[in-house]
Amino acid sequence: MNAHPSRNAPPQRWLILFSVCLAGLIMPLSFTGPAVALTAIAKDLGGGLVALSWVTNAFMLTFGCSLMLAGALADRFGRKRVFICGLAALALSALLMSAAQDIMSFDAIRALQGISAAAALAGGTASLAQVFNGPERSKAFSLLGTTFGIGLAFGPLLAGTLTQLFGWRALFLCLALLSAIALFSGQRDMPESRDPAASRLDWPGAIVFTLALSLLTYAVLLAPDSGWSSAQVIRPLTGALLFMLAFILIERRTARPMLDLSLFRYPRFVGVQLLAAAPAYSYVVLLVLLPLRFIGIEGYGTVETGMMMLTLSAPMLALPLLTGAFAHRFSAGAVSSLGLLICAAGLAWLAHYAPGQSLARLLLPMLTIGCGISLPWGLMDGLAVSVVPRERAGMATGIFSTVRVAGEGIALAIVGALLALLVGRHLAPPTANAAGAHALAMGDMPRATALLNADAARLKHAYELAFQNLLYLLALTTLASAVIIFLFLHPPARETPSSAPRITDAP
């Protein structure tokens, strides 16, 4: 570890951190905001269940599929260049969405927004790895994690307030303004950097991987409506498998691959990727499902929903920073596993809540989940760039962010499909049908009532039972993840405490 982390570091590095953190704030706002404003968007732009689901899915699909390519582009052509281009496209896409007149064009622009966000995130985080070293790097990435937490915490509240006061279009005008500020600051303060060993870009690998992940995500997103055994789902799944096999062959034969497959021989690298996926099913899915439940099933307003969601994400405001401050005393595996165990306990606790009970029965479990996930949250971004040489920071960021975001998109689709399946099982035939169960899972009570020909009380009861079962399954999955991640990230027995890798270690 560098004993003098500030030596040879650019003096404006904290201004660079401000630019990247502001860009990092835009990502969760772009993800959580439209979920709260979805009802208002639907009233204004129209669209069926499938088109409305793509308000979230289009962003997640393109964001996740573009991150690894964006990281490779950052290493090859310049991290600042990719960061600035991403922010410019983010500002433009937000302005276009604020002026959208129909749901199809809105969804298409959301896809562009996802690609733009991938470029900004990959370029920004790779730049941070170049200007910060040692303990300062750990602190910088903890601040970035806290910024993500602020966006997650206040995104629903901001979206609900803006939507109620000025309409949903104001949310995207706000995102455009934030993007412009980050763009100006980054252009002024960030130095250019690139991988000196990078030659030509691994275009075959980049294209094949993007196609594989796109087809996989697309298939999972179609499954709730078409069914897992339908040709519409089987065909893209088969294509994804074939493209992924081709990607592995390409990367093995490429001198400078986009993804160095040899890294997967190292347990800590694998552990970091598993950790990247863990929040998807323990926390992120709740950011979409809970607003749909509160607004569509329980009848809360957008501002009330934003206030309640603040309880889930408020711990992100402080705990990631505290985790970074004490990072040198504990192993990453121990801290991350402890957080996931707490999160699993909160999910099981939340499963006992039923509408009509005191708000404390709802908010305390949500607070517990938020506290638990905050512990690994402040470590993940720093860990991602600490397991590879600094010159491959863009690749590391791309891999980690791809696993994280693609995992979130796939988890959202699978969990949504699972909730619809559970709802259907709690509705006795002939009432139950797939379209009605999906509408109820999406929180669309009027449409579900019409499709299922049942009274609202019965539908709410079926939804509550299904949601309870879902939370138990998520708790069990999170518990298993805590154990597995501990085994991969915890120092082996042969290492002494002084030689064991710590959270702040960096090459």
List PLM regions with ranges:
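Transmembrane-helix exit segments and adjacent C-terminal regions of multi-pass membrane proteins
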Residues: 2-16, 20, 24, 382, ...
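Transmembrane-helix bundle of Major Facilitator Superfamily
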Residues: 2-188, 351
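12-transmembrane solute porter fold
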Residues: 14-29, 34-38, 49, 55, ...
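Alpha-helical transmembrane bundle and helix-membrane interface signal
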Residues: 133-134, 192-197, 221-234
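A membrane-interface helix-boundary motif in multi-pass transporters
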Residues: 164-174, 222-232, 301, 421-475
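Central mid-sequence intracellular linker of multi-pass
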Residues: 178-214, 263-265, 424, 428-443
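Alpha-helical transmembrane segments and their membrane-interface exit regions
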Residues: 181-184, 240-246
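Helix-loop junctions on the cytosolic side of multi-pass membrane transporters
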Residues: 184-203, 226, 249-258, 487-497
